[in-house]
């Protein structure tokens, strides 16, 4: 509603990708010690509440407000045989463009980057608009960009991204 600024639909109460992601990754971590979740000071963006971070233990790394370091860490871990998954708000992805292109993609490191809130609705103030991630990364060689349309596609893409060893996703 333009006059009130409130959305007309009710989006509360359903499943959210953050919770789905954390539950998925915790299960993968139980099955495979090489799976590592990485965040840059926003663990709840992909569902890692305090108790879920404790469940993950050493397989969860928060680098603080250091998106560049998170991508460099993911690249290094992937090169060493781990299966890193970095969860980041779309709007913060711009902070690590050099690391995405030079550390991750030039080396073709098979890390997984999960971008959240990539829309006008996701984070809707003037400094946190998150819809420029696709045009920003579209020209980076070796990077595979996937965009699921439903939960089932999301899980299929996650399975493929985490297990494949050929490209950053």
Label for each model-derived stretch:
Residues 1-169:
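Thiamine diphosphate
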């Amino acid at each position: 509603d333009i006059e009130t600024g409130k959305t007309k639909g009710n989006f509360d109460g359903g499943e959210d990708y953050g919770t789905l992601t954390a539950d998925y990754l915790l299960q993968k971590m139980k099955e495979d010690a090489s799976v590592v979740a990485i965040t840059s000071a926003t663990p709840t963006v992909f569902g890692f509440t305090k108790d879920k971070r404790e469940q993950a233990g050493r397989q969860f790394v928060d680098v603080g407000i250091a998106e560049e370091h998170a991508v460099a860490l993911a690249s290094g871990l992937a090169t060493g045989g781990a299966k890193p998954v970095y969860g980041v708000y779309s709007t913060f992805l711009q902070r690590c463009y050099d690391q995405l292109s030079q550390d991750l993609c030039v080396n073709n490191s098979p890390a997984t980057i999960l971008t959240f809130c990539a829309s006008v609705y996701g984070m809707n103030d003037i400094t946190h608009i998150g819809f420029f991630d696709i045009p920003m990364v579209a020209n980076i060689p070796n990077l595979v960009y996937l965009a699921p349309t439903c939960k089932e596609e999301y899980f299929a893409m996650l399975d493929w991204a985490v297990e494949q060893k050929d490209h950053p996703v």
